[in-house]
Amino acid sequence: MLPEAVAAMTKLLSEPGNPSSLHASGRRARRAVEESRERVARAVGCGSAEVVFTAGGTEANNIAVKGIAWDQRSKDPRRIRVVAGSTEHHAVLDPVRWLGESEGFEVTWIKSDNEGRITPDALREALGDDPTDVGLVSVILANNEVGTINDIAALTAVTREFGIRFHTDAVQAPAWLDLNFSELGVCAMSISGHKVGGPHGIGALIISRDCHVTPLIHGGGQERDVRSGTLDAPAIVGFATALEISAERRAETVARVGALRDDLVTRVMQIAPEAIFTGAKKDRLANNAHFVFPGCLGDSLLMLLDAQGVECSVGSACNAGVPQPSHVRLAMGADDDAARSTLRFSLGSTTSQSDIDKLIEVLPSAIERAKRAGVPKLTTAPVRA
């Protein structure tokens, strides 16, 4: 967390109060919440009334995907289809699947290109000749695995022709991109605190005033009757503080971290020429470096590097202890083995040159050992969008 966010949050933790209460401590907490709401709104280019606080990006995505789909179907029974990108984060992927499996919706996945990008032409293909049955389109703004940035404004220009609601998962974006909700053309956008140096367990769903959402949680309706539950005022203040500071420092951070990322990519390719740098080359998050290391299981590399003090990620989940291929890489056209041989290095505002040097020092031996271990055959079918 950013030190400023820790300080702001700690101060309010010592002054407890329920923002929904009318007594003095409640009014003090409510003032902190509403001031934070205004700060969040300024940082992402929306009105303060459009900010609905949630318990994080996953809840925000679930509220948007399920709530908008339900609302649109209730108003027009023809709208029984949900269209989403094949490279979505599981916080969108899984709710969309659930709507299809449990709620009777039809699901269409938008094809990705080989850089992880969702294009307007691919969206038109997914919508089909008669998109009057589509209640919602959801496409991630910046991919969490490979860092590719989608042109959301170009995509909403397509859905606007048919009056289709559009949601975007923008959780990865605020620290690295100039985000303006009013210019994207979406009706809902999800963001999260811990991605900007704020606390875990807090986020927001930005919802346009004309967008109606059927709530998931009932019991108080504290947030526009969209989300119920006592608000976590300290976390909200920490979130707003971090978001505000990250926006103020964005240009400098992007330039510095982007240079470190480019150095990392160049040096990795020098010591491992067989490695493949994946994702978009230009329209990409400045902090993201994603590779395929042929012949190496991504999970093996992760553990070997972790033992040397280097923390990184793979784009896979483990099912019963069996590493699964990255659904993002599969959607980009990779085969099963390549999709299990991925590794993502995510840089942050505190990443230094010495961190890059450390990685380059220990990576060759990790690759050598991972190659000796090999890539075991899958024993279960890979999960695809």
Task: Give short role names for the model-derived ranges.
Residues 1-385:
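Pyridoxal 5′-phosphate
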